[in-house]
């Protein structure tokens, strides 16, 4: 039945129509061509998740270059934008920490997301923003596909696998030449560490998406968004004073970057969390590769950092793969038929 499909929540058209309903109207009612729920989720991930998140990495790097802003301080500022969501939960009468039976998983989701963001912010400070985003998104896509196959036995169509392979290939084209020219000594060590942090950030992101898909309760999205801010503050504030040195920005550019990072990251968090409930997590991560293209454009036009021909070629492959993934999910919802 369509109602039991793991990715779609289609209306129940199995009930017999009234005798007075003309057959032509019934046929039109049961044969609706348009984007499926998965396609809608992918569009939300593309427009709200990928494009907005593409600005986060370059803006974070700008704040670091301008005021030497520590990564944990930027994470703290971002978490502050999540705390007002508690007002929504209070207004609806829902518990701030979620129902007791899923509270542990909700906190685990928040911890994984904080770890992912912390690794990402640290990575963009030592490697080019576009490359850091590339490694993080590539690892999240591959890990999401493997986790979905191992934990949920979810099948992907041939077009989906083609899109996943193409998007991952595009990321390899972008970051491959840079990995082959790492410098020896301290500089090369820090650069390699940045790529490792970016990979761990992608792994934590994929795990967090899988945990979120297992949460089913009212106000799930605002609850996990608030918990992200709460856990992020609890972890980051002590870590800032122990591991890093707090910096109070004195210029308008740094404050503008911090506000932009907080707002755009919140929008991306909400859109990605919504999208992963509608579509396969690996496909969502693949569509989020649009963040790489945006980051590369800002890296060249705003940060004035070099963009190699391989970056442009890889970005084109990524965009083509996103088009394949999105197009293969555009379908006609018909009575008694469900996409595989």
Swiss-Prot record:
Q: Name one Pfam family in it.
A: EamA
The UniProt entry's GO CC annotations, sorted and at most eight, read: membrane
Location(s), subcellular = Membrane
Question: What is the membrane topology noted in the UniProt record heading this document?
Answer: Multi-pass membrane protein
Q: What's the domain of life for this entry? A: Eukaryota
Domain EamA: residue ranges: 51-176, 223-327
Q: Which UniProt keywords apply?
A: Membrane, Repeat, Transmembrane, Transmembrane helix
Instruction: Report residue spans for region: Disordered.
Output: 11-31
Supply the SUPFAM superfamilies for this chain. Multidrug resistance efflux transporter EmrE
Task: Give the principal location in a single coarse category.
Answer: membrane
Any S-S bridges, and between which cysteines? none
Transmembrane segments annotated in the record for this chain: 39-59, 69-89, 107-127, 160-180, 189-209, 223-243, 257-277, 283-303, 307-327
- InterPro entries, A to Z: EamA_dom
**Protein family according to the UniProt entry:** Belongs to the SLC35G solute transporter family.
In Swiss-Prot or TrEMBL terms, this protein is called Solute carrier family 35 member G3
Designated gene of the protein: Slc35g3
């Amino acid at each position: 039945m369509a109602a039991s499909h793991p990715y779609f929540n289609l209306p129940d058209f199995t009930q017999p129509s009234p005798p007075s309903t003309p057959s032509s109207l019934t046929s039109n009612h049961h044969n609706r061509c348009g984007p499926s729920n998965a396609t809608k989720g992918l569009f939300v991930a593309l427009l709200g998740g990928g494009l907005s998140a593409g600005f986060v990495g370059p803006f974070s790097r700008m704040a670091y270059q301008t005021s030497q802003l520590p990564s944990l301080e930027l994470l703290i500022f971002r978490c502050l934008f999540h705390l007002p969501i508690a007002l929504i939960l209070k207004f609806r009468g829902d518990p701030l920490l979620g129902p007791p039976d899923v509270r542990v998983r909700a906190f685990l989701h928040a911890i994984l997301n904080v770890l992912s963001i912390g690794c990402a912010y640290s990575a963009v400070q030592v490697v080019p923003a576009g490359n850091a985003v590339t490694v993080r998104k590539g690892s999240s896509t591959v890990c999401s596909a493997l986790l979905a196959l191992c934990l949920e036995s979810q099948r992907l169509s041939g077009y989906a696998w083609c899109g996943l392979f193409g998007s991952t290939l595009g990321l390899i084209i972008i970051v491959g030449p840079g990995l082959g020219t790492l410098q020896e000594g301290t500089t090369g060590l820090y650069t390699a560490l940045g790529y490792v942090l970016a990979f761990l950030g992608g792994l934590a992101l994929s795990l967090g998406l899988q945990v979120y898909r297992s949460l089913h309760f009212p106000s799930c999205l605002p609850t996990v968004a608030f918990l992200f801010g709460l856990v992020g503050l609890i972890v980051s504030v002590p870590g800032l004073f122990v591991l890093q040195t707090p910096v109070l920005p004195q210029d308008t550019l740094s404050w503008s970057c911090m506000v932009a990072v907080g707002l755009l990251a919140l929008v991306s968090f909400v859109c990605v969390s919504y999208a992963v409930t509608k579509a396969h997590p690996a496909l969502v991560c693949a569509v989020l590769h649009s963040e790489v293209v945006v980051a590369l454009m800002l890296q060249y036009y705003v940060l004035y950092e070099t963009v190699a021909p391989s970056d442009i070629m890889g970005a084109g492959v990524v965009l083509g793969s996103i088009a394949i993934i999105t197009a293969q999910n555009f379908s006609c919802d018909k009575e008694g038929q469900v996409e595989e």
